[in-house]
C-alpha cells in the first residue's frame, strides 16, 4: 500500500510540505532583504548564520522537552512564534523601519523556533509508519521538503519581484500556519512538573548515549563536516544571482529551485545507488561528487556549468541527509529518539551557521568563486574522515555496521 494512502502520514507529509514552502519563502525574503539593505558577502552570510546557529541553543532542549512532555507541547508554541515573528516583520517593512539589526534579530528568532519544531516533528514519522518502510517514509518526506525547496524559492522570488517583501512574508506566514493546525491534532501527553535540572540531565544523557555509540557519533561528525563546507552554495546563492547572472530576486529564487529540483532527483535515485555499496562508501562518494560540483563552479565561469553544479549538489545534499537521518531514526533507542534527532539537527545547523559565516568572510576578502574553491577542498578532505569511520565500522560486529543499521533497523 502507498504510504500516502496512510491518512496520518498523508496529513503529516502535506503539512511538512506546506510549512517547508513557508520556511523557504521566509528564507528567500530575509536573505534578499539583506542583499538590498547591505549587500556585503559577510552580511549575507551572517543571515544564514542567524537562521542556523539558534539550533545550538534550542534543538537539544526542545528534543528533551518533546521526549518528556510529548511533541505537541513543543511543536505548537514554536510554530505560533514563527507566525508572530513574520507578522512583526511585515509591520516593520510597512513602517519602513526595518534595518540590519532588526533583520538579524528576527532571523535568529525564526531560526530558534524552526530548530525547536524540527526534532519533534521529524521523529514523529517513526510513530505513524512501520519500521520496514521508515527509510522510504523519511525519503518521501524529504521529497516533500525538497519539492518545497524547489517551489518555495521560485514562488518567493516571484512574489518578491511582483508584490514586494511584505506580501511575500504574509504568504509565508499563511503556509507556516498549516503545520500549526495539524500540530494541534497531535496526542497530548499528560503534563507533569519537570525541573530545569531534569531537562539538562535528559540532554546530557542523550549526548553521552550518542557519544558512546560510534555509529551515531560518526553520523553526527560526518553531517557536521558536510554542512560546514556545503552550506557555501546556499548561503552565497544570492551573490551568484547578482554577480554571475547580474539579476535580481526572481533569478535567485529560480537558482534555489534548481537546487531543490536536484534534491528531488536525488530522492528518486538514491535507493538504487545506496543499496549497491556499503553506506560508508556511498557517503564518501557523495562527499567527492559534491566537491567536484563546487570545483567546476570555481574553475569554469559559465552559466550552464553553474546551473549543472547547483543541480548535482542539490542531489548530493538530499541523498546524504536522508540516509543519515534514516540511520539515526532506526538505530537510536525509542526513549532517546527525539533527542538524537535534535543532536542531528544541532550538527546540521551548527555546521550551516559556522560555515556560512566563514564562507561569507572568505567571499568578502577574495571572491565568491574563491569561497567555492576553498569549500570544495575542505569537503574533499572531509571524505577521508568518512573513509576512516567506515573502516572502523567494518571492524565491528556485523549487527552494528552502519549499512546494517540503515537497512535492517535498530540492532537492539
Q: Residues of each region from the PLM?
A:
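Hydrophobic alpha-helical transmembrane segments
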Residues: 100-107, 111, 136-189, 250-251, ...
Amino acid at each position: 500500500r502507498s504510504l500516502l494512502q496512510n491518512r496520518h502520514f498523508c496529513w503529516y507529509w502535506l503539512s511538512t510540505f506546506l510549512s517547508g514552502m513557508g520556511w523557504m519563502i521566509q528564507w528567500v525574503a530575509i536573505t534578499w532583504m539583506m542583499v538590498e539593505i547591505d549587500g556585503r558577502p559577510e552580511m549575507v552570510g551572517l543571515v544564514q548564520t542567524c537562521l542556523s546557529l539558534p539550533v545550538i541553543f534550542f534543538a537539544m532542549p526542545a528534543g528533551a522537552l518533546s521526549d518528556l512532555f510529548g511533541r505537541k507541547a513543543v511543536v505548537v508554541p514554536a510554530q505560533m512564534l514563527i507566525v508572530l515573528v513574520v507578522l512583526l516583520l511585515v509591520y516593520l517593512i510597512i513602517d519602513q523601519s526595518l534595518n540590519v539589526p532588526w533583520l538579524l534579530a528576527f532571523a535568529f528568532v525564526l531560526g530558534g523556533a524552526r530548530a525547536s519544531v524540527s526534532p519533534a516533528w521529524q521523529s514523529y514519522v517513526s510513530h505513524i509508519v512501520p519500521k520496514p518502510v521508515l527509510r522510504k517514509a523519511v525519503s518521501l518526506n524529504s521529497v516533500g521538503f525538497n519539492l518545497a525547496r524547489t517551489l518555495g524559492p521560485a514562488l518567493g522570488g516571484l512574489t518578491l519581484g511582483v508584490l514586494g517583501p511584505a506580501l511575500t512574508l504574509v504568504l509565508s506566514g499563511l503556509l507556516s500556519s498549516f503545520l500549526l493546525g495539524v500540530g494541534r491534532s497531535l496526542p497530548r501527553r499528560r503534563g507533569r512538573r519537570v525541573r530545569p535540572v531534569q531537562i539538562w540531565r535528559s540532554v546530557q544523557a542523550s549526548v553521552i548515549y550518542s557519544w558512546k555509540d560510534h555509529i551515531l557519533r560518526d553520523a553526527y561528525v560526518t553531517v557536521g563536516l558536510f554542512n560546514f563546507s556545503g552550506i557555501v552554495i546556499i548561503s552565497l546563492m544570492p551573490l551568484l544571482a547578482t554577480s554571475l547572472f547580474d539579476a535580481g530576486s526572481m533569478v535567485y529564487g529560480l537558482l534555489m529551485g534548481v537546487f531543490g529540483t536536484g534534491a528531488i532527483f536525488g530522492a528518486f535515485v538514491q535507493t538504487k545507488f545506496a543499496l549497491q555499496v556499503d553506506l560508508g562508501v556511498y557517503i564518501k562518494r557523495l562527499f567527492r561528487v559534491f566537491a567536484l560540483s563546487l570545483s567546476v563552479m570555481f574553475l569554469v565561469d559559465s552559466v550552464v556549468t553553474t546551473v549543472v553544479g547547483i543541480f548535482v549538489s542539490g542531489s548530493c545534499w538530499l541523498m546524504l541527509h536522508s540516509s543519515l537521518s534514516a540511520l539515526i531514526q532506526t538505530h537510536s533507542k525509542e526513549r532517546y529518539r527525539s533527542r538524537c534527532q535534535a543532536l542531528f539537527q544541532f550538527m546540521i545547523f551548527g555546521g550551516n551557521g559556522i560555515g556560512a559565516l566563514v564562507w561569507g568572510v572568505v567571499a568578502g576578502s577574495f571572491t565568491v568563486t574563491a569561497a567555492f574553491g576553498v569549500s570544495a577542498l575542505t569537503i574533499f578532505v572531509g571524505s577521508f574522515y568518512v573513509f576512516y569511520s567506515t573502516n572502523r565500522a567494518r571492524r565491528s560486529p556485523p549487527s552494528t555496521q552502519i549499512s546494517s543499521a540503515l537497512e535492517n533497523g535498530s540492532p537492539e
